[in-house]
Amino acid sequence: MSTSINLKNTQFYKEVRGVSMENQRNLRSMSNRMLSVNFPPSKCALWDPAPMGDPFGLHFSYYRNPRLLVSEKALRLSSRHAKTGRKPFSCFLLGTFSVDEDEEGVTLTVDRFDPGREKTGSGSSKVPTAQLPGDFIIPCTISIGKGSNNVIVHTPEDFTSSFMSLQSHLHGKEALDLAKLLAMRAHITYTENMDNLHFDLHWAAVTVANTFESTPIKPVPIIPTALARNLGSHNNIAHLQGTHKSGYLTMDQTRKLLLVLESDPKVYMLPLVGIWLSGITHIHSPQVWAACLRYIFSSSIHERVLSESGSFLIILYSLTHKEPEFYECSPCVKHDPLGFQLLTCQDTLHLFKNAEVSKNPLLRFELSSECQELEADLFNETCKNKSTTVFKQSPLPNKLSTSDHDSGVEEEDFSPRPSPRPHPSVQQVSRIHPSVPELSLVFSSFFDPKSASHNPENRTRNNSPFSSTPQNVNNMFAGAPKPNKEPQPCDNQASGLLPRPAPSLNTNSTAMKPSKVKSSPADYQPPHLQSSNQIRRNSTSTSSAFSTPRSGCSPDSTVHQVKGSCEQEQNINGSAQPQGTTPLMRSGSYSRQVSSNFPNHNVTFPLHSRHVAEVAKPSPNLAPFHQTNVCTSCHSLVSCHSKNCWPAMGHLTYHTMENPPETCESVMPAYQNVVCPSVCCPQTAGKTEFCSPVDLVLLSPGRRDSLPLNPCSPHTCRHTPPPVIPTATGMLGLSTEAYRLFAEQDKQLKLLQAQIQRLLEAQAAESEPSKTTIPNNSKQKQVESVSTEQEIKTSVSIAVSTGASLFWNPPCPEKEESMDKQDDSAFCNEFSVNVNTEDTSHATITSSIRAVDIHSFSESTQLTDRGNCTASLHVSHERDDASYPLPDVQQDINNSKSLSNQTDHTESPNTAEIDSGVSAVPPEKFYQDLLAQVNNLLKTSSTEDEMTSTKIDSGHIIEKTESLPCNPTENNDKNVLKATLKQLKSLGVNIDMNTSELQATKADTADSASILACINPEAVIPRLNYMSFSNIGLSGFVPNGVDLSMEANAIALKYLNESQLNQLSLSHANKNKQSDSISYNSLLPGTTEKSMVGLSLISPSNMSFATKKYMKRYGLIESSDSSMEEPDLANASSFALTPMSSDSTSENRLFFNDSCKDGNFVTCEEQKRKNADVDSAIGWAHHPETNKLRNITNEISGKLINVAPLQEDRPLHFLKDLKARTKLSAGKAQFTQHPEKENTGDVQFFHEKHDGFSGKKSLGGPSTVGDILDVNRLRQLPKLF
């Protein structure tokens, strides 16, 4: 007998089911919410500070002085520009800032010269014209005359501006850039005597003087988050991106470290105990020093938690260690605010005027702290005046505390909040920094980011400059009275910050030079001092490689000596004080020794930053001083400061004891470099604390002369009335810095609205443009374009990789060819393709652009044409008048066109006459003129293209130059060949060729072609364009190609139109491969890209419109036809110096007829047209104009390669299988068997044998993908993008 029982109704089941459901809800809620990180309640002994090794000094000039490498070409260009005017010429030197491979120093490489342009809205200030991301800018002043040793590079305003820029970078939230921690200027005195060029070079730089010491300690547990696991793996984010990464450290209640990214919005609201870094090899890297500066002086950090000794943590994920390294880092001078240091270098240089550039053109200099007298005095005086100004401009202490919630002061909160703010009008707007620097559209009234700091409105709103510390601890001197008497000097008083013990120290200033142990790799003889018959250098500098000592012991070979006797240090202190130095009183009881030889100063500027509540209990009767209130005796260091104030930074929780004691006995580590300031015993609740007489503390091992000096402290402690923490002075409860940011953004928004309004008005006014008739004569067209562009009063320039086209000088501007056939529509087509597919590699961009040299075009013609031909063709490109805010290159070129087409043998007018109509710029017509230019570019008729190309193909119009009459029949060929050879020599290519022979041998021709193809290998970058994916997808074009049909289909569907898809389908559907003669050039908007390796940065596709016109007009690059089908033989560039043979022409013509007989009617019409063009090209190939060097890139010209029949005794290594032809198939320009080894060894071109124009090639086999781009199949596939 069985009975069914329902257990669901029992009480036990209900209870068990209820418990399980409750547990599931709890687990679900715990998984859905993020567990909060609670900082340990006790902030003492957060980690074990026991040292595990010797400490390391952190400063970018600690082990090696900064090195400066200057290009000889940049100096020559600067002298060429300077001699055009009598007054001092201001310009810019551009370069790159890099860390050395051993990470013991930094190197500044200056390789470009920029003449600069006048800044809009300012009288005489200039800005660089071709600045790229990552460029290091050095303002330079060039004067002509006899040099002097008493040259002052900086002005007081320059020093103040440098101080402000260094402080603002350390206080802000922008990405930390080590190059912005060095502000540099130069002064060059230039003298020319006969063939000698004499340069007096003066370099001066301002940097941050604060240093740190890092000591290895035992590992601290780390919470295994995703970030920590990624940094500990071999493929971490820093390794993949090829750069270093940094962030901050906090702790949870179990005293485990939590790694936080610097971009985390909550990072500034957490108590931070240190920093972490990844992608760095050594702890002494300058990147670590910069990260420590940002951690100490950042105004956005809410709370810094330091150890009992005032140190913070550093976790280094080194590239050479599997496990992270742990260090305890401490500032070397705890009570100092942000300090500055002056580095200078002086040297002389002799060059020969007409000599070639040496093989190693980089001139080496070294910046040292052994400063010049006048420069150092001005630096000291500026620091002194700025300190006095800071005291006068300090705001009065406010009696309201930030902890008082009824005070009306709103704390600025940068964390995201879902609820609306009380003041929506000042809601924070994030700045957007674009990451596409390749494309630039520059107006004459552009916004300069530097103008924010120089804006008079900002100055009136911010009554005082930036500060190195947050404002709530920055008013230590506000309520301090003036001293009644000077501090009493004593023998054991700290008078300066000394280096490690030297064998002997005297009483003069030279005794403060640091002792050097390691031979630095920087100590080598410059190459221009060894064996050079062209350069003589007088090392009169105090910072040359021989006279300047090294800055410190390298951690790789020497062991730092830490400990020493206190008596020895006292003797050193007493003997090393420089003579003639007077203490500079920073406040009533704060003084600093100022040394003229070592001008390291700490200048504090009030920072208007946000205020946050104190973590500890506020003490309104205590003064938050900058100094570390530490009393020192002979053998012990005692802390007697409050727990909620810390020197030189805001909200540094320093927990040693709960109340300030009357007697202090706690001992600190002996290697800390601390002294007792005078204001170390504040009056607290009626209790008075005293400090013992000051003794020296053992100096840290890494000290050197570049560090700031310690203050001179008196014996007695004075009572000073404490100032109260002031409130924010900004608008609507915000700080002034935040309000200034919002006001600046509001100003930019208003300006943008006004611009949009003007554009709309101009567009409405020109809604019905009148269509102009197309002139039949090209000269009439040029005159018309000039007349329309004369109305443009404001300059506009749009460019890609601006400056890349100025890599070479013109060979010989004796004759020029017409540029009518390349109109603006072709420029627009080429621009649209290459901008979308171009790779942005900053390193290659910087390396390919050598100099912005406008004058070099006109100067080189004097050397090439023996001085008998003027540089009138390029005179419109020069800018000597200071009234032009931005040069309109395209307009100047059109003006030059009209002048060259009007009359024969007329002298060229100067620049002022050409551009007389461009001086006044009415702003209301600016956008109308801009729209007129854009419409002119976009509405160019295709009929005009055909007329122009037909005219040039039939008869090649050779323009007469605006120069003195020469004898073209006798000297033209010879001059062209000499100019070509000289141009090659200037590029470092030496060709042994007899200049008297006009026709070079075929072996020399091939060698020249191979050399020209490998001149600039670093600029060869694989790009994404139509040729790139067609080559990748077809194994017939690439010897080791792979089948990437799906990717090719997807890209073709997205980027190609119907006609291009049909042509690609026809070219691959034919199994006999007869239709390959349909050149892929017709699928491209121009004929500039003929090969994969031709897609370098110095190719015409990366030039601006105006630059491309300029280069093509003067024969510097090849000219391409704007039509899609007709080939261009007129302006095709040729590497060969031999004329085309008639045999090869007839052979090509015969091959055309055979290919048409085979039934391939698709290309018959095109081949007939090409065959007709061959006849007209026979005489043109003999013309000496074609012997010019047109294309100095890595691409083989797709237009014409003329190679005479081979000789058996002179075999060609590169073109032996290539027959003479007038056009190459772009798809076959595969140069190397392995593309990754393109520019190494003997490069062999054309692995396949090309037979005429048919496009036939020996494919790898029948397995090639012939239907990759079938149109029917493409339309059926889904779009992948």
Swiss-Prot record:
Domain of life, per UniProt, equals Eukaryota
- InterPro entries listed in its UniProt record: Sil
Q: Name one GO cellular component term.
A: cytosol
Taking the first listed entry, what is the main subcellular location of this protein, grouped into a coarse class? cytoplasm
Biased composition, class Polar residues, residue ranges: 390-401, 461-475, 528-560, 567-592, 770-790, 891-913
Location(s) in or outside the cell = Cytoplasm, Cytosol; Cytoplasm, Cytoskeleton, Microtubule organizing center, Centrosome, Centriole
Q: Does the keyword Cytoplasm apply?
A: yes
Q: Where is this region: Disordered?
A: 390-431, 450-592, 765-790, 879-915
Task: Give a GO biological-process term.
Answer: mitotic spindle organization
Q: Which keywords appear in this protein's UniProt record, sorted alphabetically?
A: Cytoplasm, Cytoskeleton, Developmental protein
What the protein does? Plays an essential role in early embryonic development. Plays an important role in the regulation of centriole duplication.
Q: What is this protein called?
A: SCL-interrupting locus protein homolog
